[in-house]
Amino acid sequence: AKTTPPSVYPLAPGSAAQTNSMVTLGCLVKGYFPEPVTVTWNSGSLSSGVHTFPAVLQSDLYTLSSSVTVPSSPRPSETVTCNVAHPASSTKVDKKIVPRDCGCKPCICTVPEVSSVFIFPPKPKDVLTITLTPKVTCVVVDISKDDPEVQFSWFVDDVEVHTAQTQPREEQFNSTFRSVSELPIMHQDWLNGKEFKCRVNSAAFPAPIEKTISKTKGRPKAPQVYTIPPPKEQMAKDKVSLTCMITDFFPEDITVEWQWNGQPAENYKNTQPIMNTNGSYFVYSKLNVQKSNWEAGNTFTCSVLHEGLHNHHTEKSLSHSPGK
């Protein structure tokens, strides 16, 4: 995918919606590639009450939203600006968020919806492990306390299914609510590229909101896995780092875990998949261990799950050799 700058849209309630002492303003950053973008409010001077949601990848482009809750009086229209920066395209956009005034009292005017809907893919480990259940997740955020319940409908290749598990809505720290629906899916349905659609409806929405997701299209390519022992310069410290480099794989869905003498290890961190110039991806994983455990000759194993691999799994081990 080529570098694409974002489009930025202000999200503001109408004056009729500003009945309490606070008002939530939003900023939708849509259709950019690659990650990341940064969103600040009033060039960073406004940080309290800010909630920026994770980016979602659809059709090879990213979308995210950010909201800020501010006092509704005095009117914030002169002071609230959403600042968006996309370094990859050298794009900087400033959008002033102006609450709409419909000029009619006490009528209710049509306003942009502040609620946002996101759809998330199943975890790669769930898709590639036959004993686990992969799930596609649909999340609605920024639901007002006074809004009616939202209804979820799910479709697989445009055929409605009724097996989703919808949780009661949960109150968030900013006094809005979040509603989540999870659809258990068949492993092969995801791997074969079927399309999953979440339709969200509510009396508070002017129209249903639909989000779709499917596996990234393209021929799977198995990763190459390399393990790297701690550098000599680190051996003077109490803790050392073992590195696993996983490269040249496609699509980006991958699981990387570590074991220590066959038991799950926890003290590791993975990077997000990063695109190579040829369209494949690479990931680094770092496991921190006590130097004494490394020097004792314990075996540390980097375990990788990816659909391009034989049996979807491979692993590489490393251990300290005396005298090295």
UniProtKB/Swiss-Prot annotation:
Region of interest: CH1: 1-97
Location of region: CH2: 111-217
Disulfide bonds: 27-82, 138-198, 244-302
One Pfam family of this chain: C1-set
GO molecular function, one term: antigen binding
Protein name (Swiss-Prot/TrEMBL): Ig gamma-1 chain C region secreted form
Glycan-linked positions: 174
Biological processes annotated in GO: antibacterial humoral response; antibody-dependent cellular cytotoxicity; B cell differentiation; complement activation, classical pathway; defense response to bacterium; humoral immune response mediated by circulating immunoglobulin; immunoglobulin mediated immune response; phagocytosis, engulfment
Residue span of region CH3: 218-324
Species this protein is from: Mus musculus
Gene Ontology cellular component terms for the protein in this record: cytoplasm; external side of plasma membrane; extracellular space; immunoglobulin complex, circulating
Keywords noted in UniProt: Disulfide bond, Glycoprotein, Immunoglobulin domain, Secreted
Gene name linked to the record: Ighg1
Listed CDD domains: IgC1_CH1_IgEG, IgC1_CH3_IgAGD_CH4_IgAEM
Hinge, as annotated region: 98-110
